[in-house]
Structure formats: structure tokens, C-alpha cells
């Protein structure tokens, strides 16, 4: 899958993975679902769900460390800045051959355009926050969020195209 294909999929994902409502109980249910999926995949994650700058769910699985919390914060900041997933932001920057600090003037100590943070969007209302994970390779973090969100909103298994590592454009 090349860069253009991945960007197109990221746009589709953000359009399709919208919720009808979201409250504190929803955050708890989604966070638990992410934890169970991580356990099933054998990966230790730090998990954070933030709405309107308030943390509604936070959990650090055994095997994570304080560094994972920092990655959560940095990825979440990208969603808040650009209103797109942290993975899609990285792809857009790569396409434009630039970086967060060069394009937006932000510190890379506070922002990370790597997979693992996804906007929480309410249908017909907009983005209210983000769901964030850290602990696996960043593409795996992103794909885990796609899987869990798709299942959480009731999309059929396999209806969301998971992303694969980038391949160069063929000439």
C-alpha cells in the first residue's frame, strides 16, 4: 500500500468511525474494549481517552512505562492540533516533505505524528476528543484502534481496511 492509498483509507476511516453519542460510561466501555483487544493480541498498552481536555479513561497495562504516557500526550496533541489521526498527520507531513516543527512551529517534545491517536467524532456534531494508545509499533497502535472502534460502533468484522507498511510508488 502506498502513501496515497493510505491517506485515502485514513480519510475513509475518519468518516466511517463516528459515534452516535459519547459520555463517561462510553469512555469506560471503549477503554475496556481496547484493553481486552490488546491482551488478545499479546501487547502491553497505555490507553487514554480524552474529551474536551478531560481524561475520561486512563490505564497502563503491565509492561508499559512512563515513556508510554508521554507518547500518549504527544500523539493526542497532534489530534487536537490537526483534527485527524496522528497516523494520518504523519502521512500528510511525509507527502508534503515537511515536519510538525517546520510546518506548524510546534516542539517535537510535545507532538508526535505517529500512529496511536484517533479523533473521537460524534455524527453531525464533530470531534470532541481522542482515543490514544502507546506500546506497540505505531502502525500496530493505529490498526488496533481501527479494529476496536469499528467493532465498538457495530461495523461488520473486516469492513475497515487495516493499513500495511508503506511501499514505494511503482514507476
Swiss-Prot record:
It comes from the Bacteria. Belongs to the UPF0303 family. HAMAP family: UPF0303. Coiled coil: none annotated. Gene3D superfamilies: Haem-degrading domain. Pfam families: HbpS-like. PANTHER family: PTHR28255, UPF0303 PROTEIN YBR137W. This is UPF0303 protein YPTS_2661.
Amino acid at each position: 500500500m502506498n502513501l496515497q492509498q493510505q491517506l485515502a483509507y485514513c480519510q475513509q476511516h475518519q468518516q466511517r468511525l463516528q459515534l452516535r453519542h459519547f459520555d463517561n460510561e462510553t469512555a469506560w466501555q471503549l477503554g475496556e474494549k481496547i484493553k481486552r483487544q490488546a491482551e488478545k493480541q499479546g501487547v502491553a498498552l497505555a490507553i487514554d481517552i480524552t474529551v474536551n481536555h478531560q481524561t475520561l479513561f486512563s490505564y497502563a497495562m503491565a509492561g508499559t512505562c512512563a515513556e508510554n504516557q508521554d507518547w500518549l500526550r504527544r500523539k493526542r496533541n497532534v489530534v487536537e492540533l490537526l483534527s485527524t489521526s496522528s497516523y494520518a498527520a504523519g502521512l500528510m507531513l511525509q507527502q508534503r516533505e515537511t515536519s510538525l516543527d517546520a510546518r506548524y512551529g510546534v516542539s517535537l517534545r510535545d507532538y508526535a505524528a505517529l500512529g496511536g491517536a484517533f479523533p473521537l467524532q460524534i455524527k453531525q456534531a464533530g470531534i470532541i476528543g481522542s482515543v490514544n494508545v502507546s506500546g506497540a509499533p505505531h502502525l500496530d497502535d493505529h490498526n488496533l484502534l481501527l479494529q476496536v472502534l469499528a467493532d465498538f460502533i457495530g461495523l461488520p468484522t473486516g469492513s475497515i481496511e487495516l493499513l500495511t507498511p508503506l511501499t514505494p510508488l511503482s514507476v
